[in-house]
């Protein structure tokens, strides 16, 4: 069991080293450095929820914006064929549709970002609790009770009864 944990720990350390090397490569790029030193980059660095919301919004809006630009290019060809009135109507309707889609995506990206943040906080709390519990149980098995006033949790009671 200890060797599996050691192997897992070594793999995680190797992965952390690779991730740090990758992040250094990105951060050493001159354009990234210029962006991070700009007021907008500093604002995003100080507000991670806004950054996550913006990332989700941009990721989700690429396809509708691409479809809109394809539609605009297709209607531009139709202009060459003298269909000016139809083009104006189609671009107006598609522009309104794009506006509606992007507004919906903006609201959805805020919700997704909020869910991701809550999941991260809840997950890290659970993992921290599990780790603290495993450390406490392991310490108690090796050296006796941790304290005289220790009250057993429901999980400890179920473990001791089985």
From Swiss-Prot:
GO BP term, example: lipid droplet formation
Superkingdom of this protein's organism: Eukaryota
Keywords: Endoplasmic reticulum, Lipid droplet, Membrane, Transmembrane, Transmembrane helix
KW Transmembrane (keyword) present: yes
Entries under Pfam families matching the protein: Promethin
Side Cytoplasmic, residues: 1-42, 87, 131-162
Similarity field: Belongs to the LDAF1 family.
Protein name: Lipid droplet assembly factor 1-B
Lineage of producing organism: Eukaryota, Metazoa, Chordata, Craniata, Vertebrata
Chain's gene name: ldaf1-b
